[in-house]
Design a protein with these regions (language model features):
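Glycine-rich ThDP/TPP pyrophosphate-binding loop and its adjacent helix/strand module
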Residues: 1-137
Length: 137
């Protein structure tokens, strides 16, 4: 019988540079693990580089679909879109939500900058970031 719970996996697109992830993706699709949902933070950045400078991941949704997954691609900053993907009717396959996002969104000096993947802000930068995020509300 099918499991009556759902399992969620959250991963970054940089992790998709690793073969073991694709082995697991292929296995889950082959076995029809319909209670499994993966959420990919597709910000196109990883430790030290842009993902596309390491290995080209696009067309990412087509790759997941080829391994038997339902694909839901959204604006990763749109919480309603995320909810719709997660709450939508379930099929007989695992589901992936590809959440296209912008690392550092809302903070001018952090947006889409590789170095902020691991960098710690100074006290001044932290205060500026808080102010910018507060102004965006």
């Amino acid at each position: 019988s099918k499991a009556d719970w759902r399992t969620f996996v959250v991963l970054g697109d940089g992790e998709l540079q690793e073969g073991s992830n694709w082995e697991a993706i292929m296995f889950a699709g082959h076995k029809g693990l319909s209670n499994l949902t993966a959420i990919v933070d597709r910000n196109r950045l990883q430790q030290g580089a842009r993902t596309e400078d390491t290995n080209r991941l696009d067309p990412l949704g087509d790759k997941w679909a080829a391994f038997g997954w339902e694909v839901c691609e959204i604006d990763g900053h749109d919480y309603n879109a995320l909810y719709e993907c997660l709450a939508g009717p379930r099929g007989d396959r695992p589901r992936v939500v590809i959440a296209n996002s912008l690392k550092g969104k809302g903070v001018s000096f952090m947006e889409d900058r590789v170095e902020w993947h691991h960098k710690v802000p100074s006290a001044e930068q932290f205060d500026l970031a808080k102010a910018e995020l507060g102004a965006a509300k």
